[in-house]
Swiss-Prot record:
Mostly expressed in flowers, seedpods and roots, and, to a lower extent, in stems and leaves. It catalyses: L-methionine + ATP + H2O = S-adenosyl-L-methionine + phosphate + diphosphate. One of its GO terms (cellular component) is cytoplasm. It holds the Pfam family S-AdoMet_synt_M. This is S-adenosylmethionine synthase 2. K(+) binds at E43. CDD domains: S-AdoMet_synt (cd18079). Mg(2+) binds at E9. Catalyzes the formation of S-adenosylmethionine from methionine and ATP. The reaction comprises two steps that are both catalyzed by the same enzyme: formation of S-adenosylmethionine (AdoMet) and triphosphate, and subsequent hydrolysis of the triphosphate. Binds 2 divalent ions per subunit. The metal ions interact primarily with the substrate. Can utilize magnesium, manganese or cobalt (in vitro). Binds 1 potassium ion per subunit. The potassium ion interacts primarily with the substrate. It is found in: Cytoplasm. Its cofactor is Mn(2+); Mg(2+); Co(2+); K(+). Induction: By ethylene, polyamines (PAs: putrescine, spermidine and spermine), methylglyoxal (bis-guanyhydrazone) (MGBG), and AgNO(3).
Length: 393
């Protein structure tokens, strides 16, 4: 059987685009915590010594946007110009207006509609994906790249590698077999880590520390062999980082947020959006659907698509593809999905408890992926029992 290589990347929380995602979701959390009916579309951009939040927010919440921006930057580790941004002294610009009344009347009828009548906040199509290659039912290439990024942050914050700075990127290439449509990982072919560092550390020390404290604890030994290639800070120098190195924008890391290039993507970003925005809630419910199909044993690998029209509650279409791994025909799996899941936005909000903010609930999603996480706040990761006499776990 012929193998093939597939690559996924990740960035950690100090990457400028991810910093923006986290600020947008921290603002969403603050709004929903005080007012679960908040309508939030919050974008963030950043460059040297500046963060700007802008968008449309309609809420009864009393939110100090500047304070949230500075706290989020500080928590990530942006505490001086040396590391790429000084949370306490950077410029913070705020340009936030109310949601357009045209959108408001079309979507929620100014809160007069019942939950099942609430229309989609916009048109669009979203995809959910699941695969049996990892316990998380996520692609291994994506899981490993994401966990390497999270481990980089962990060893920076706990002092194990004091030379680390907040910005960093990871990338993992996995060798796979295609087993009748299911993906079977064989080995890790290449590991790439580029991390921001201080002036004091040598490239040899960087490579040794990354192998010992980041790669070894994350990548299972069975996937590494003498042929595995390591590119550790291959550019040779990465002192300038964060918003000083690159401009950042909310919604620029949508593949990292989802499935690492596997499955498909409708193009809509997640962060800074309340659950009437189907870019987010629609993607969450189809992940739950795909995961539940694979967990139930109906298929080894699965993608689910849903699509919407603005102001219309019922989805326009639902699609299922099991890549030939289904125990039953895809059209029967589709019927089970339609019976088991309510794709109307108002009902997704209720069933996945998406109006509950605060406590960093959505902030947590904004770094290290929205899917495959073992956390009670990630309600869409709960496997749902499927309604059908054909399901045998």
């Amino acid at each position: 059987m012929e193998s093939f290589l597939f690559t996924s990347e990740s960035v950690n929380e100090g990457h400028p685009d991810k910093l923006c995602d986290q600020i947008s979701d921290a603002i969403l959390d603050a709004c929903l915590e005080q007012d679960p009916e908040s309508k939030v579309a919050c974008e963030t951009c950043t460059k040297t010594n500046m963060v700007m939040v802008f968008g449309e927010i309609t809420t009864k919440a009393n939110v100090d946007y500047e304070k949230i921006v500075r706290e989020t930057c500080r928590e990530i580790g942006f505490i001086s110009d040396d590391v790429g941004l000084d949370a306490d002294n950077c410029k913070v610009l705020v340009n936030i207006e109310q949601q357009s009344p045209d959108i408001a009347q079309g979507v929620h009828g100014h809160l007069t509609k019942k939950p099942e009548e609430i229309g989609a906040g916009d048109q669009g199509h979203m995809f959910g994906y699941a695969t049996d290659e990892t316990p998380e039912l996520m692609p291994l290439s994506h899981v490993l790249a994401t966990k390497l990024g999270a481990k980089l942050t962990e060893v920076r914050k706990n002092g194990t590698c004091a030379w680390l700075r907040p910005d960093g990127k990871t990338q993992v290439t996995v060798e796979y077999f295609n087993e009748n449509g299911a993906m079977v990982p064989v080995r890790v072919h290449t590991v790439l880590i580029s991390t921001q560092h201080d002036e004091t550390v040598t490239n040899d020390e960087i490579a040794a520390d990354l192998k010992e404290h980041v790669i070894k604890p994350v990548i299972p030994e069975k996937y590494l062999d003498e042929k595995t290639i390591f590119h550790l800070n291959p550019s040779g120098r990465f002192v300038i980082g964060g918003p000083h190195g690159d401009a950042g924008l909310t919604g620029r890391k949508i593949i990292i947020d989802t499935y690492g290039g596997w499955g498909a993507h409708g193009g809509g970003a997640f962060s800074g959006k309340d659950p009437t925005k189907v870019d987010r809630s629609g993607a969450y419910i189809v992940r739950q659907a795909a995961k539940s199909i694979v967990a139930s044993g109906l298929a080894r690998r699965c993608i689910v698509q849903v699509s919407y029209a603005i102001g219309v509650p019922e989805p326009l279409s639902v699609f299922v593809d099991s890549y030939g791994t289904g125990k039953i025909p895809d059209k029967e799996i589709l019927e089970i999905v339609k019976e088991s899941f309510d794709f109307r936005p108002g009902m997704i909000s209720i069933n996945l408890d998406l109006k509950r903010g605060g406590n960093g609930r959505f902030l947590k999603t904004a770094a290290y992926g929205h899917f495959g996480r073992d956390d009670a706040d990630f309600t869409w990761e709960v496997v749902k029992p499927l309604k059908s006499n054909k399901v045998q776990a």
